[in-house]
Curated annotation (Swiss-Prot):
Disruption phenotype: RNAi-mediated knockdown of the protein, performed in utero by electroporation in lateral ventricle of 15 dpc embryos, results in a massive neuronal migration defect and in the development of heterotopic nodules along the walls of the lateral ventricles. At 20 dpc, a significant arrest of cells within the ventricular zone is observed, while, at this stage in control embryos, cells have reached the cortical plate. It comes from the Eukaryota. This is Endoplasmic reticulum membrane-associated RNA degradation protein. Signal peptide: none annotated. The gene is Ermard. It is found in: Endoplasmic reticulum membrane.
């Protein structure tokens, strides 16, 4: 493993950004009277603050540098004012004005951090305040607007917020957190550029007071407009259970991380206080705080690796306002901004990249960074499991960037080796391919319920006679022929399936499990592969709906049969249902097998030309249409069981024709006619 060398870096802020944040606001030495900024009962005098904002001579564009310079003394006065208050005084004077954010207790914690004078804690406070403020401002936006902007800078620039708070007030916020031309405190911290000593505490104090001032302005607006502020519900982390692969964090793991972070070249020494605070927050069960710190420092460390392996050391620093920062978006991408291949994915390896994409990027993953940074999660209820997984992953990553002979005893411990092994075997769990595997297995489990549901013997005998009709026999024959064809592409370990006898069965379940445990390459999937996966997942979802409906109908009709509440027509329909179910179960099982096999070979779609790809997608969409119609026909409202059989025969004919022409993806699998599930 190549080791990152040379830790002489004192800041990750570019010269202009460093000057803007660390120096410019200290150049004016005037002393501001705090009474001109805030009244004795805590009301913010906004004009004293907005008058400090400067604009370009022509037009209304902000002069960010001059604004930062002129706001410096105001921030200093606010900081001294906040510092002069006891906790009780601060709570009495300002807590009522934080209620609009739904997290008033957060601002007391920020006060405590300022009192502690711990730089890392103050930086964390700015991160938390920015995300909380963004969420609260989004709620205010929705008083007037319909769709809240995703990015904070777009939210602050919106006409809706300017209408509520005034343009001048919004310009003040832009200087602090809304533009790369200003202090941009939110982004330099959340993206891991700013070290603890880079953030002057007075800016945290200023944001603390400004948020209270916004609460005062909002109260006035709500009073005059007679409207009520509604808060959007917090979101939960999607599919978090899927990405839990490491055991829970133990004291041994925490101790190991504390040791490794002082030896690993992954992190810059100027960032060490953040790592120390992250461990401390985990120990005190502040899991959201821990995760916020780890995310920003994971990005900082990976940016360092990115800059090294791609031979672009300047990318370690914040870019100037005219250039995009190097963030997770580019660090984890296939290509760099100039179009060249990003070397970091190859260097880190697919398992590590899969983990990062699962946690951060995939739409069906927890997307922890987005959720936390935009204030979408209730940080008081942030799950320990999420913090545990990220912390353990960071430990394994830091170990990779230690000298070979360093910490040799620690690396040889069984508990540590287990974590390394789990990380090295990680496979994506939030990519659409894995989610399809989950869906197929879930539906197969549902289908296994059908034969074991209680059924009246008399109705079963009638249904059995109906199953002998010509259409049902034709369907059974087609199923057998298609299965016989698919058998050539099953894993070598699978037993041959003869007709319907193996549908469904214990071996059938084992077969689908084996197919769905096949590792599918997921990183940087091409568009055509994703298009195929969308349709395959649509088919699987509809199959699940059919199964759920059939189970619910069978249970209801059986209960009505036992209770003698079935009318004559319902009884006849029940018999037709039982007859159709005997056919639909193997058909749905066949479709699940087809989905599993096509998924294993999904990358073979590249072997088709453009016309063949479109033909293949039309074939899949035909099956999708069938399953959608089946959902309608098997619903309690329609109960069109005979029509469902006719529909089934038509789709089986199309599947057989397509299969006979060797046009499915399994037919394009090279070198072998068996699926390799190793």
């Amino acid at each position: 493993m190549e080791i990152l060398t040379g830790d002489s870096i004192t800041t990750c802020l570019s010269p202009l950004v460093h000057d803007l944040i660390c120096n410019l606001g200290f150049e004016l030495t005037e002393i501001c009277d705090i009474n001109s900024i805030v009244t004795q009962n805590g009301e913010v005098r906004w004009k004293a603050i907005t008058d400090r904002v400067s604009y370009a001579e022509l037009g209304h564009s902000l002069d960010y540098r001059q604004s930062v310079q002129r706001l410096g003394p105001v921030c200093e006065a606010i900081h001294l004012h906040i510092s002069s208050l006891s906790r009780a005084q601060f709570e009495t004077q300002y807590s009522p004005w934080y209620q609009w954010t739904t997290s008033p207790e957060l601002f007391l914690e920020i006060y405590d951090a300022l009192e502690s004078s711990q730089s890392a804690a103050i930086s964390l406070s700015v991160m938390k305040l920015a995300s909380c403020l963004e969420r609260a401002l989004g709620d205010v936006f929705l008083l007037i607007g319909n769709e809240c902007p995703f990015l904070l800078r777009d939210l602050l620039a919106s006409a809706e917020l300017a209408h509520v708070f005034g343009h001048a007030v919004m310009d003040v916020l832009k200087v602090f957190i809304g533009s790369p031309c200003g202090l941009n405190l939110r982004n330099v911290l959340w993206h891991g550029f700013a070290s603890p000593q880079d953030i002057p505490p007075k800016y945290c104090s200023a944001l603390l007071l400004l948020t209270a001032g916004l609460g005062q302005l909002l109260k006035s607006y709500l009073h005059h407009t007679k409207v009520q502020l509604a808060h959007r519900p917090f979101v939960t982390l999607t599919n978090l259970e899927d990405v839990i692969v490491f055991p829970g964090v133990t004291d041994k793991v925490l101790s190991a991380l504390e040791t490794v972070m002082t030896k690993s070249s992954f992190l810059l020494k100027i960032m060490l206080p953040y790592w120390e605070l992250a461990v401390s927050k985990f120990k005190s069960h502040r899991f959201a705080d821990c995760t916020m710190l780890l995310l920003s420092q994971l990005e900082a460390g990976l940016r360092r690796v990115f800059a090294t392996v791609n031979k672009c050391p300047d990318r370690l620093l914040t870019a100037e306002s005219t250039i995009l920062y190097t963030t997770f978006d580019e660090i984890l991408a296939k290509h760099m901004s100039d179009g060249s291949i990003n070397q970091l994915p190859c260097f880190l390896g697919e398992p590590a990249m899969d983990f990062l994409w699962d946690f951060l990027n995939y739409q069906e993953g927890p997307r922890i960074r987005d959720r936390l940074s935009h204030g979408e999660i209730n940080i008081r209820e942030f799950p320990k499991a999420a913090a545990s997984q990220l912390l353990t992953f960071c430990l394994v990553l830091l170990l990779r960037f230690t000298e070979e002979d360093t910490l040799s005893e620690l690396k040889e411990e069984a508990a540590i080796q287990l974590l390394v092994s789990l990380a090295e075997r990680y496979r994506s769990r939030c990519h659409p391919a894995f989610q399809l595997q989950k869906q197929v297995l879930s539906c197969e489990k549902s289908l296994r319920m059908w034969p074991v549901l209680p059924l009246p013997e008399e109705c079963c005998q009638e249904a059995g006679r109906s199953e002998g009709n010509s259409e049902a026999c034709a369907c059974n024959s087609l199923i057998s022929k298609i299965l016989c064809e698919l058998c050539h592409y099953l894993p070598a370990s699978a037993c041959a399936i003869n007709g319907l006898d193996g549908l469904p069965s214990e071996k059938w379940s084992q077969l689908l499990n084996e197919l769905c445990n096949t590792r599918i390459p997921t990183l940087f999937c091409p568009k055509i592969v994703l298009e195929v996966l969308v349709v395959l997942r649509g088919i699987s979802s509809q199959c699940q709906r059919v199964s759920d409906q059939v189970i619910a109908s069978l249970q209801l009709r059986h209960r009505q049969w036992v209770e003698h509440t079935l009318r004559s027509r319902q009884r006849q329909n029940y018999v037709r249902m039982l007859s159709s179910v005997g056919l639909l179960c193997p058909v749905l099982s066949l479709i699940l097998l087809l989905l599993a096999l096509e998924l294993v070979s999904v990358h073979a779609v590249h072997g088709k030309d453009a016309q063949e790809r479109q033909q293949y997608l039309r074939f899949l969409k035909l099956i999708l249409q069938y399953t959608e119609n089946l959902v309608a026909y098997t619903s309690r409202q329609k109960n069109k069981w005979n029509e469902a059989v006719s529909l089934t025969r038509a789709v089986l004919l199309r599947i057989w024709t397509f299969s006979e022409k060797k046009q499915m993806l399994i037919h394009l699998t090279k070198n072998t006619n068996k699926v390799d599930t190793g």
